[in-house]
Amino acid sequence: MSEIVDIYAREILDSRGNPTLECEVFLESGAFGRAAVPSGASTGEREALELRDGDKGRYLGKGVLQAVDNVNNRIADELIGMEASDQVGIDQRMLEMDGTEFKSNLGANAILGVSLAVAKAAAEEAGLPLYKYIGGANARELPLPMMNIINGGAHADNNVDIQEFMIMPAGACCFAEALRMGAEIFHALKGVLKAKGYNTAVGDEGGFAPNLKSNEEALEVIMEAIVKAGYKPGDDVLLALDVASSELFDKEKGIYTLENEAQKEKTPAQMVDFYENLVNKYPIISIEDGMAENDWDGWKLMTDRLGKKIQIVGDDLFVTNPKILKEGIQKGIANSILIKLNQIGTLTETLEAIEMAKRAGYTTVISHRSGETEDTTLADLAVAVNAGQIKTGSLCRTDRVAKYNQLLRIEDELDTTAEFKGHNVFYNIKK
């Protein structure tokens, strides 16, 4: 009864007002799954290709009608009649149809929309919530959230170089408590920024996006907000950064440029010095993309210097790609991977990357993109694989809060079997 009888895609809008693809899959039993595909602003060079129409007279060239057509007139014909429960077989069939390394034929947005909608339809057919369908009986760990409360870089129109300044309420006893702590700190931060005369407009991911005197001032105002909300930095709340340093790197010169620092140009070694100083001064537990995706020597230097003290997360570096992750593991680069479904383009390959990371002792962080929708798949995925951490933006904007609300529902449903590990999610770091 899980046979696919129809697949339909349409063009919808994401949280930035850009088109994206939504897909629906219908089964013989009447079960149904719907999924919408996110889109990134700072993207890795080796990400799977997001197919855009390029017609400047329509949505400024960002339409996805070709990807929609690929679903409705190519993928649908191939998959109708297959069993939705055969996730690996379905994903493999689409990869064979595409036939390219980066999914540039059908488009990763077309393939991912179908892949996720199939999983949702199969879960409904099985009478299971998505997290249990994907993860089985052991899917019960609620993730520690990385909450992006100050936005900079490519996510905001301000002078802050570092793309994301995040809080992690690791001292909470459960996910609901962590969410409450994050929301209270977010509101306290608004008051701190207002008192200093700073703008409290928000960026793509719902964090504040003020012009600040330096990147370090962002950490100072967050520390002040944590205390103002009644919490203790380092015990109750940890800090995390996403530098998105590929955006700051001159490949030819081998130099990073941080416009908001006194010493603007930095070598990879000086960048590590910069991070080490911040880690020694503030309760920073995690730095994502501290080096550019092509600066593997810089990554090795950073991992050797800081990899025992903090979580070093590869995003643009690994692009959720098992082949690239394998190379990084072999070379001892980073100790954590950021997981973004649309970087690789199928649920099967995403699960493969997560499994590979865990076997190597790397932590995993399930992540949204800056262009999001109301789709909450990644919340279910975080619990399904017991990832331990999730990164899905700030404490405002429905496209971000939708994921947090889904995690509240899951925690409620799991009841006494739910786990929340707090500080203990960083199992590969010496305390």
Curated annotation (Swiss-Prot):
Pathway: Carbohydrate degradation; glycolysis; pyruvate from D-glyceraldehyde 3-phosphate: step 4/5
Residues given in the record as Mg(2+) binding sites: D242, E288, D315
Functional description taken from the UniProt entry: Catalyzes the reversible conversion of 2-phosphoglycerate (2-PG) into phosphoenolpyruvate (PEP). It is essential for the degradation of carbohydrates via glycolysis.
This enzyme's EC code(s): 4.2.1.11
Family: Belongs to the enolase family.
Subcellular location: Cytoplasm; Secreted; Cell surface
Cofactor remark: Binds a second Mg(2+) ion via substrate during catalysis.
Keyword set includes Metal-binding: yes
InterPro entries: Enolase (IPR000941), Enolase-like_C_sf (IPR036849), Enolase-like_N (IPR029017), Enolase_C (IPR020810), Enolase_CS (IPR020809), Enolase_N (IPR020811)
Pfam families: Enolase_C, Enolase_N
CDD domains per record: enolase
Protein's name according to its UniProt entry: Enolase
UniProt GO MF annotations: magnesium ion binding; phosphopyruvate hydratase activity
GO cellular component: cell surface; extracellular region; phosphopyruvate hydratase complex
Cofactor field: Mg(2+)
Active-site residues, record numbering mapped to chain: E205, K340
Chain sites annotated for binding (2R)-2-phosphoglycerate: Q163, K340, R369, S370, K391
Provenance organism: Trichlorobacter lovleyi (strain ATCC BAA-1151 / DSM 17278 / SZ)
Primary location group: cytoplasm
Enzyme class, spelled out: lyase
A GO BP entry: glycolytic process
Swiss-Prot/TrEMBL catalytic activity: (2R)-2-phosphoglycerate = phosphoenolpyruvate + H2O
Alphabetically ordered keywords of this record: Cytoplasm, Glycolysis, Lyase, Magnesium, Metal-binding, Secreted
PANTHER family per UniProt: ENOLASE
Leader peptide range in chain numbering: none
